[in-house]
């Protein structure tokens, strides 16, 4: 369940809460709260947007956008006041979305950049200087990096044209799995406007491959 709790004194129940699917991702962007679908047969295959009503201290004005089943849209990145990007993890595309109407206005195809399967697994990106830097996880059917592809790929997308400008890669460190699609703090800029990307690798589960850490995309590059 999801609800606003302006006063934590006294008792709280879920009588006025918004029901969610199991482990449904929730993301706040400015005054909007987005609820993404869970996986499985019980999923509501849509993305819902609620607006925070300050005077009423409630989430109001729900608008939703239907999405294909089991495609894992998990985050939304604001580009302008009306435009946002929604990557679909298993589909290998990014939808261009009107935030106000929750309508799809376009699509960016990333499937040609996949290592072996049909999706390069676009994860959690960030906008800097008019460019959308979107890490590609490039994982196998076990949700782990390919043993023959231990590198970091990032799609660089022009936010004016919505076109892939290039794919940049870091291969020397043998890092992989750059960001998880539900964890926004795995990618950020510092005070110098450099982008840092956390790379999980095999999450420490493979004793022969323990590489993890950060890659950096310096400002101006």
Give the residues covered by each predicted segment:
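Blade-loop segments of beta-propeller domains
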Residues: 12-78
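Repeated scaffold domains used in trafficking and secretory/extracellular systems
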Residues: 19-31, 68-79, 115-126, 176-187
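Short coil/turn segments that connect the beta-strands within blades of beta-propeller domains
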Residues: 31-32, 81-82, 129-130, 192-193
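Short loop/turn segments immediately following the C-termini of beta-strands
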Residues: 37-41, 87-91, 137-139, 200-203
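Beta-propeller blade signature
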Residues: 49-51, 96-98, 147-162, 210-220
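Surface-exposed loop and turn segments in beta-propeller and other repeat-based domains
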Residues: 61-69, 108-120, 164-182, 221
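Short, conserved, GDST-rich strand-edge loop motifs in beta-rich repeat architectures
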Residues: 134-151, 197-211
């Amino acid at each position: 369940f999801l609800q606003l709790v302006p006063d934590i004194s006294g008792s709280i129940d879920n009588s006025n809460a918004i029901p969610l699917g199991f482990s449904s991702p929730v993301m706040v962007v400015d005054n909007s709260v987005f609820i993404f679908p869970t996986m499985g047969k019980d999923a509501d295959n849509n993305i819902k947007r609620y607006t925070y009503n300050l005077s009423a201290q409630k989430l109001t004005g729900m608008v939703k956008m239907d999405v294909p089943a089991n495609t894992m849209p998990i985050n939304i990145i604001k580009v302008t006041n009306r435009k946002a990007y929604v990557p679909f993890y298993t589909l290998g595309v990014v939808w261009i979305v009107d935030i106000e109407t929750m309508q799809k206005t376009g699509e960016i195809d990333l499937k040609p950049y996949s290592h072996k399967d049909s999706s390069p697994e676009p994860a959690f990106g960030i906008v800097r200087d008019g460019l959308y830097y979107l890490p590609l996880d490039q994982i196998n059917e076990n949700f782990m990096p390919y043993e023959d592809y231990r590198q970091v790929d990032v799609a660089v997308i022009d936010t004016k044209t919505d076109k892939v400008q290039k794919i940049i890669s870091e291969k020397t460190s043998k890092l992989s799995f750059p960001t998880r699609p539900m964890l926004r703090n795995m990618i950020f800029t510092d005070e110098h406007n450099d982008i840092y990307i956390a790379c999980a690798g095999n999450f420490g589960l493979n004793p022969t491959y323990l590489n993890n850490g950060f890659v950096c995309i310096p400002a101006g590059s």
